[in-house]
């Protein structure tokens, strides 16, 4: 924790010097692309965006009658640009109940350097494996893991590697990636390969991927993942199919199917979820059913930096029964806070 405070102190001083001395000169032309939309931006902001995300609350496991107040996680985010073409992104778990080891780089979800030119990008560093699932793609503190699949809880997604992106049209991304294999068990010369497509239209969004995860020399586990999100006014519906295996039986022996409808309004969101799963994982070789429902509320009119939530779930593999999660998530933008402080001096 002392290292964190030292780091934040240095970061604050660096931001302060940049804000006070170079605020006007910190803008320059940029060709910028996101995962789904390669588009031109007129300016680039060299001041890093530093923020903290936190979530905590009360959880009640009804199967074991075990209830307690707890903190779900404290995350540090740093994003910025080194030049008009080079950007970086950093997300680190200062504390988290979702992972057993948060020390050193084990506590880093991603640490990437990206070079963008035209409709192409190259990214190197630690990143999430491309996997076509909106359940998997959600941020840790935006996900209620007690209503998620067994695969979500057991897949070691954060890996070192390199990836490339091609953005042929607005809202379209073709992504390729090579990383260390999540099935390597710590051994070298075992790699994972991913080819993904993300598309976005007014009424539909896709995230599909084909994956190979090497577990021995010349031996791979294959995976096909089809994430689909439909937009119907204020309603969204996620429909996902994921399958894994080493032979043609993968489509019936190891798979996950999920449906998640949601309704969103100005100051809140309500959602439900239903999933069926069959897995050949060594620790849990069985079928699983998981269901849940919840609501999120945003008490601030000007932004969504504070979120209240209540979520119920039933997950046979996770708790063997019902679970209730009540809590709050909040975001503190340290860069904006320092800018406002300096503007008053």
What residues fall within each predicted segment?
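Positively charged n-region of N-terminal signal peptides that target proteins for export
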Residues: 1-4
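Bacterial N-terminal signal peptides
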Residues: 8-16
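A structural preference for long, well-packed, hydrophobic secondary-structure segments
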Residues: 15, 87-88, 93-94, 155-156, ...
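Beta-barrel outer-membrane channel/assembly domains of diderm bacteria
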Residues: 20-122, 164-172, 309-313, 322-345
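Surface-exposed coil loops of outer-membrane beta-barrel proteins
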Residues: 23-27, 51-63, 99-101, 121-198, ...
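Outer-membrane beta-barrel pore domains
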Residues: 24, 47, 55-65, 100-101, ...
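Transmembrane beta-barrel architecture of outer-membrane proteins
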Residues: 53, 70-74, 106-110, 157-161, ...
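Short, electropositive alpha-helical surface patch
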Residues: 105, 181-185, 292-294
């Amino acid at each position: 924790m002392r290292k964190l405070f030292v780091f934040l102190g240095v970061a604050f001083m660096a931001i302060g010097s940049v804000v006070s001395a170079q605020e006007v000169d910190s803008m320059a032309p940029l060709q910028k692309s996101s995962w789904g939309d390669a588009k031109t931006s007129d300016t680039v902001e060299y001041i890093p965006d530093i923020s903290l995300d936190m979530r905590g609350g009360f959880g009640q496991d009804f199967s074991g009658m075990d209830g307690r107040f707890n903190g779900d996680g404290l995350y540090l985010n740093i994003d910025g640009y080194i030049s008009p073409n080079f950007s970086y992104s950093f997300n680190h778990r200062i504390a988290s109940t979702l992972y057993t080891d948060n020390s050193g780089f084990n506590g880093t979800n991603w640490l990437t350097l990206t070079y963008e030119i035209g409709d192409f990008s190259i990214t190197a560093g630690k990143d999430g494996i491309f996997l076509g699932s909106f359940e998997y793609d959600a941020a840790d503190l935006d996900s209620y893991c007690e209503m998620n699949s067994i695969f979500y809880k057991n897949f070691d997604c954060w890996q070192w590697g390199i990836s490339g992106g091609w953005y042929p049209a607005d809202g379209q991304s073709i992504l390729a990636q090579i990383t260390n294999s999540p099935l390597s068990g710590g051994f070298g010369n075992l790699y994972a390969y991913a080819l993904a497509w993300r598309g976005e239209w007014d009424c539909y969004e896709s995230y599909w991927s084909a994956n190979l995860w090497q577990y021995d020399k010349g031996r791979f586990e294959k995976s096909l993942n089809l994430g689909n999100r439909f937009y119907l006014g204020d309603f969204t519906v996620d429909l996902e199919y994921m399958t894994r295996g080493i032979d043609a039986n993968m489509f019936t022996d190891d798979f996950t199917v999920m449906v998640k409808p949601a309704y969103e309004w100005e100051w809140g969101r309500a959602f439900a979820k239903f999933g069926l799963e069959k897995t050949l994982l060594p620790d849990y070789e069985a079928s699983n059913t998981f269901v849940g429902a919840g609501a999120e509320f945003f008490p601030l009119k000007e932004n969504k930096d504070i979120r209240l939530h209540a979520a119920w779930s039933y997950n046979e593999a996770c708790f063997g029964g019902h679970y209730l999660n009540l809590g709050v998530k909040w975001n503190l933008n340290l860069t904006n806070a320092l800018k406002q402080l300096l503007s008053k001096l």
